[in-house]
Amino acid sequence: MIIQSKDITKPVRESADVCIIGSGCGGGASAKVLAEAGKKVIVIEEGGYFTSGDFDMTEQTAYQNLYRQRAGQSTDNLAVTILQGKCIGGSSTVNWTTSLRTPDFVLEQWSKIFDVGGLSSKDLEPYFDRIEKYLNVHIEPEENHNPNNRIILDGARKLGYTAQASGRNTRDCKKAGACGLGCPFDAKLSVDVTYIPDAIKAGAAVFANFRADEIDVSGKLKRVFGSVVDQSTQKVKTDFIVEAPVIIVAASAIHSPALLLRSGIANSSGEVGNHLTFHLTSAVLGVYDRIIYPAGGIPQSALCSEFLNKNNDGGGFWIEAVPVYPTLASLAIPGFGNGHKELMRQYTNIGASIVLVKEIDSEGAVKLNDYGRPSISYNFGGRDLEYLKQGLKLAAEIHFAAGAKRVMTLHSQKTEFTSPGEISGVLANAEWGTNEIALYSAHPLGTCRMAEHPLRSVVNSHCETHDVKGLFVIDGSVTPTSLGVNPQMTILAIAEKSAEWIAENRLKKM
């Protein structure tokens, strides 16, 4: 069952074998595994509960109901916009369905540098196999790629680079283009229509609009204290307490460390909130003399990853298509006044690609502000900046190869090319400082780092905190490094594997 704040009229007191904070990939997968193992599971989610009938394919509704800060969450200096879901299903409800396995070189690095055990490619293969079957992860046939994805496939191949289709977790996709706004057809097999319903079927209880404020681990039973929030007004209605011997924090790489910091727990290493990575992202736009319509069709089904770890340094970049909805386009498209209006009038003829950087020199941190909410910082530079420049150059070349008449980046000062020969010179003279180029992330990672040494990490290889037995963090915050792929498959696999370990080793007798 799903209990919403509108159903609550008095303080809530509950107990369970395990309380899971967050209902995205980490929390949802953990809930299903543990509920099906016969454990009493309670999931609490700060966001609301919405179904396909609530998804009207408009940005106004989606940003208000499904995203953190109405899609306006950012670093403190406003340099990086951070897109995260805040609803049952978490970010899986609003992602673009790309489903990729963790690269082998990343898992090898985790083992060699951080002594992570049990997460090799061989260890995770059965989990990936099972998840891909469960979520119907598949490659789209050639005829299903929309014009925006064809830019990458056709343009990269014309230049002699490798581009390929990417896996997607959908079934009977209607190609409506609304993945980022909530799928109105339940065709996207996100956590809200897969793991959460199956967890409920196995006996789990899910509470929507329940915000975890603090965790107390001082007693025999751990306790989660929080607030029941009205979905419409966002005002606190009452409070809740959930008691359980096992707590799983699965609130994302931004909000999991914030919760631990507010609670004053699991931080003997001083590492809670550190090592934030973003897969820092910017975009390249091409203007064509044909209709592209960047918000139509399957939003993301192709990529070029040839330059990921090409120098064997663990870094690099990859390029994907990005669906550009009108409101998002109006914010991202460079220029002011008549120039901006002229570009928006050509909206249907614009193709958009994103460059995502797998950081090796850059990282940030999540701390607490004066109100106990996340304060997010990020320092970008070194080899990562060079990879971003290389990626933007390649993406621009791909657009020209695909037939674009002019191409632009998202610099605050006009940065536009009318031929491939102009790209290098224009980018060399562009400004790259803070807020000089629009930067984004939908993949915050790493703020509760996993490693076997307790002085350099927050959790061990089973996602259990070094400091508190029975307290786990299971979400994107545990990755020791950035991934180089969209993270949902990695998080799901780690969650399923860790939840199995919890059932066998921490809840065996329950």
Q: What name fits each language-model region?
A:
Residues 60-140, 355-365, 369:
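Redox-cofactor-proximal catalytic regions of oxidoreductases
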Residues 24-25, 254, 478:
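Residue-level detector of alpha-helix initiation sites
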Residues 481-499:
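A conserved FAD-binding loop/helix module that cradles the flavin
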Residues 33-40, 47-52, 56-57, 201, ...:
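Glycine-rich loop(s) and the adjacent beta-strand/alpha-helix scaffold that form part
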Residues 113, 117-214, 218-221, 406-437:
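Conserved redox-cofactor binding core of oxidoreductases
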Residues 95, 237, 269-399, 433-435, ...:
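FAD cofactor-binding and catalytic pocket of flavoenzymes
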